[in-house]
């Protein structure tokens, strides 16, 4: 097929030669196009690849940032014209080649006699037209189209053999290539962007959104979160690695976390149980508390009056606060909030520091001790004589 195309181009150039060429005619280089041992099916093959007029969207589902102008197309498989029978076609091709050889000899003879006799310009043109007409008829008899199927959008040359129709234009198959890698696309699927064709691999590498986790192009479903795009399987908790469910996620320092881990790691902790505080809470002693956890550290009684006493970072009721401080009256067992008397390692309300026998207040602070009890001097002398 390529030899016949070259022959047609050579013959067309011959018809356009001016009068200067007749003064020294050169033989057509037909010897360069000798017949090859090829199957007639290959010689007479006609391929027409039709383009879909309504290309599919580039990203079919779940994409959020692929522009609508990106188009995914697929050219139809090549279709061949029914070839003539091998026997008759081979005979016609032999006859055609013999005719061309004869014409070559005639042109060579005219070249040798060019100095003695210059052929008439009209006779030469008529001869070439006749030869071309006969060649076109014989090619048509073989089922080979002699009228160009259009001009290639890449090289701008006529297309006489296989043709691809894509992007609203015609192409030589070898010239319909990926804009980026220059690999031949042929009838393979391709993507269109801004009027240019791309193979699927290059299109995704150049234009598809990329996963914020693995940085690879996202070819199918895409998840958008935190102003980034992700493969759905790559959007998971930064702590436990679990993929997020219907409950969603929480963000901290530009990282996603599931609810459980987020609360465990970043929510305020109760000062009593050290568990996350989610709803109602109390704020005291520079921390937060579950209401049920804010109780006395000894008796676990809640502070109904709203007042409490702090000791070593823990809340206490008044009684147990003074008990831990050692400020309970040894006489009545109640907290001492005012003046007190210290004796025998204990503290007493002044009114409760009395003689254990006569109950007289030891106001002067003079007393006698016996068996961990206080006595005034007269009672002590009576009860414990020497």
UniProtKB/Swiss-Prot annotation:
Chief location bin: cytoplasm
Position of sequence motif LD motif 2: 70-82
CDD domains hit by this protein: LIM1_Leupaxin, LIM2_Leupaxin, LIM3_Leupaxin, LIM4_Paxillin_like
Subcellular location: Cytoplasm; Cell junction, Focal adhesion; Nucleus; Cytoplasm, Perinuclear region
Tissue expression remark: Macrophages, monocytes and osteoclasts (at protein level). Strongly expressed in cells and tissues of hematopoietic origin. Highest expression in lymphoid tissues such as spleen, lymph node, thymus and appendix and in the vascular smooth muscle. Lower levels in bone marrow and fetal liver. Also expressed in peripheral blood lymphocytes and a number of hematopoietic cell lines. Very low levels found in epithelial cell lines. Expressed in prostate cancer (PCa) cells and its expression intensity is directly linked to PCa progression.
Residues where Phosphotyrosine is found: 22, 62, 72
PROSITE patterns according to UniProt: LIM_DOMAIN_1, LIM_DOMAIN_2
Record's GO cellular component terms: cell projection; cytoplasm; cytosol; focal adhesion; membrane; nuclear speck; nucleus; perinuclear region of cytoplasm
Residue stretches making up the LIM zinc-binding domain: 150-208, 209-267, 268-326, 327-386
Post-translational modification: Phosphorylated on tyrosine residues. Phosphorylation on Tyr-72 is important for its inhibitory function. Bombesin stimulates phosphorylation on Tyr-22, Tyr-62 and Tyr-72.
SMART domains in the record: LIM
Ranges spanned by the short sequence motif LD motif 3, renumbered to the chain: 92-103
Residue numbers spanned by region Disordered: 13-41
Sequence positions bearing N-acetylmethionine: 1
GO molecular function annotation: metal ion binding; transcription coregulator activity
Keyword tags: Acetylation, Activator, Cell adhesion, Cell junction, Cell membrane, Cell projection, Cytoplasm, LIM domain, Membrane, Metal-binding, Nucleus, Phosphoprotein, Repeat, Transcription, Transcription regulation, Zinc
LD motif 1 (motif): residue ranges: 3-15
UniProt subunit comment: Interacts with PTPN22. Interacts with unphosphorylated ITGA4. Interacts with PTK2B/PYK2, PTPN12, AR and SRF. Interacts (via LD motif 3) with LYN and the interaction is induced upon B-cell antigen receptor (BCR) activation. Interacts (via LD motif 3) with PTK2/FAK.
Similarity remark: Belongs to the paxillin family.
Domain comment as written in the entry: The LIM domain 3 is critical for focal adhesion targeting and the suppression of paxillin (PXN) tyrosine phosphorylation. The LIM domain 3 alone or both LIM domains 3 and 4 can mediate interaction with AR.
Protein name: Leupaxin
Protein species of origin: Homo sapiens (Human)
Gene: LPXN
């Amino acid at each position: 097929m390529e030899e016949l195309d070259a022959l047609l181009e050579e013959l067309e150039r011959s018809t356009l030669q001016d009068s200067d060429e007749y003064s020294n005619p050169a033989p057509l280089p037909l010897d360069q196009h000798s017949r090859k041992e090829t199957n007639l099916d290959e010689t007479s093959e006609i391929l027409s690849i039709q383009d879909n007029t309504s290309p599919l969207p580039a990203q079919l589902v779940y994409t959020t940032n692929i522009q609508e102008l990106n188009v995914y197309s697929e050219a139809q498989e090549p279709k061949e014209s029914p070839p003539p029978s091998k026997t008759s076609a081979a005979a016609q091709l032999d006859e055609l080649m013999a005719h061309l050889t004869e014409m070559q000899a005639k042109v060579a003879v005219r070249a040798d006699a060019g100095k003695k006799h210059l052929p008439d310009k009209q006779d030469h043109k008529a001869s070439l037209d006749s030869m071309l007409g006969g060649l076109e008829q014989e090619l048509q008899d073989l089922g080979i189209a002699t009228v160009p199927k259009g001009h290639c959008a890449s090289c701008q040359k006529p297309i006489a053999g296989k043709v691809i129709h894509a992007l609203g234009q015609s192409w030589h198959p070898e010239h319909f290539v990926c804009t980026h890698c220059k690999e031949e696309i042929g009838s393979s699927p391709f993507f269109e962007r801004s009027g240019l064709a791309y193979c699927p691999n290059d299109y995704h590498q150049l234009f598809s959104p990329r996963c914020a986790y693995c940085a690879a192009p996202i070819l199918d479903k895409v998840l958008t979160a935190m102003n980034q795009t992700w493969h759905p399987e790559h959007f998971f908790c930064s702590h436990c690695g679990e993929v997020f469910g219907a409950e969603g996620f929480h963000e901290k320092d530009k990282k996603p976390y599931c609810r459980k881990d987020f609360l465990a790691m970043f929510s305020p902790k109760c000062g009593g149980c050290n568990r996350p505080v989610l709803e109602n809470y109390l704020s005291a002693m520079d921390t937060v508390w579950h209401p049920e956890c804010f109780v006395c550290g000894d008796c676990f009684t809640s502070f109904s009056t709203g007042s409490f006493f702090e000791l070593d970072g823990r809340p206490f009721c008044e009684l147990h606060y003074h008990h831990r401080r050692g400020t309970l009256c040894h006489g009545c067992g109640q907290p001492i909030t005012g003046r007190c008397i210290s004796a025998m390692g204990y503290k007493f309300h002044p009114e409760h520091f009395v003689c254990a026998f006569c109950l007289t207040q030891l106001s002067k602070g003079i007393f006698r001790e016996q068996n961990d009890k206080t006595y005034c001097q007269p009672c002590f002398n009576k009860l414990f004589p020497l």
